[in-house]
C-alpha cells in the first residue's frame, strides 16, 4: 500500500471509531462535517458556501451547476462557488458504508493567505480559465490535517482551541498544492468581494501610519 492508501485506511478507522451518525453531520470543529451513508438515496443540497471534500470509502456522483462528477476513495472535490447540488453515494450499504469528510472554506481567509504567495505564481495561475468545481488528488499534508480534524471528534472539548489552526493550514495547503492552479483564478483581485477584503487587510497593516 502507498502512503496515501495507508493514511486513508487510518482515517477510515478513526472516523468509524468515532461512530458518526448516518447522513451529513456537523462536528465541534466549525465547518467540518462527516458524511456516512448506507444506501444510494439521492440527496439535494445548497449549502451557500464553498467547500472541499474527501472520500474515504465508496464512490460518489455529484451534479453541480449542470455538470456531472464521479470520484472515489482517495480523491477530493473542491467547489469554489455556492451552487445547488445533487449527490448519490454509489453502492453504499451497511456492510460497506460510504464515508467522507468535508470542510466549508472561508473566502476571506483564502484571499488573505493568497496575498503571501509570490506574485509570479499568482499571475501564472490567473492566466488559467476559472473552473469552480473540480476533482483532485490530495497531498499527504492535506490528508494529515483532515486526519487531525477527525481525531478531534474524540476530544470535542479541544476543538475550539485546536481546530482553527488546522483549518487555517488547510486553506494554505489548498493555495499551494495541486488545487492552486484552479483555485487562485477564482480569487482574482477584480472580484468585488476581494476588493473589500484586501482593503480591510491594508487597513490592518497600516492603521498606525499617518495618512
Feature map (PLM): residue ranges:
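N-terminal regulatory/effector-sensing and dimerization cores
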Residues: 24-122
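Alpha-helix N-cap/helix-initiation sites
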Residues: 45, 159-164
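A short, Lys/Arg-enriched amphipathic alpha-helix from helix-turn-helix/homeodomain DNA-binding modules
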Residues: 135-154, 163-167, 171-175, 179-211
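A short secondary-structure junction signal
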Residues: 113-116, 147, 161
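Aromatic/histidine-rich interaction motifs
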Residues: 115-144
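Active-site oxyanion-binding pockets that recognize sulfate/phosphate
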Residues: 96, 153-160
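A short, N-terminal "cap"/entry segment at the start of jelly-roll beta-barrel domains
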Residues: 1-28, 33-34, 41-42, 126-130, ...
Amino acid at each position: 500500500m502507498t502512503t496515501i492508501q495507508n493514511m486513508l485506511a487510518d482515517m477510515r478507522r478513526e472516523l468509524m471509531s468515532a461512530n458518526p451518525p448516518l447522513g451529513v453531520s456537523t462536528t465541534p470543529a466549525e465547518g467540518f462535517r462527516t458524511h456516512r451513508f448506507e444506501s444510494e438515496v439521492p440527496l439535494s443540497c445548497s449549502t451557500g458556501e464553498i467547500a472541499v471534500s474527501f472520500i474515504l470509502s465508496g464512490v460518489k456522483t455529484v451534479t453541480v451547476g449542470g455538470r456531472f462528477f464521479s470520484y472515489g476513495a482517495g480523491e477530493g472535490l473542491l467547489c469554489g462557488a455556492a451552487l445547488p447540488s445533487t449527490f448519490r453515494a454509489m453502492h453504499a450499504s451497511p456492510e460497506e458504508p460510504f464515508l467522507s469528510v468535508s470542510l466549508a472554506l472561508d473566502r476571506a481567509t483564502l484571499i488573505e493567505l493568497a496575498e503571501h504567495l509570490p506574485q509570479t505564481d499568482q499571475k501564472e495561475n490567473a492566466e488559467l480559465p476559472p473552473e469552480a468545481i473540480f476533482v483532485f488528488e490530495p497531498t499527504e499534508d492535506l490528508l494529515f490535517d483532515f486526519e487531525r480534524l477527525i481525531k478531534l471528534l474524540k476530544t470535542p472539548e479541544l476543538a475550539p482551541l485546536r481546530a482553527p489552526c488546522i483549518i487555517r493550514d488547510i486553506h494554505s495547503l489548498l493555495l499551494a498544492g495541486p488545487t492552486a492552479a484552479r483555485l487562485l483564478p477564482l480569487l482574482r483581485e477584480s472580484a468585488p468581494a476581494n476588493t473589500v477584503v484586501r482593503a480591510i487587510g491594508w487597513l490592518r497593516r497600516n492603521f498606525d501610519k499617518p495618512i
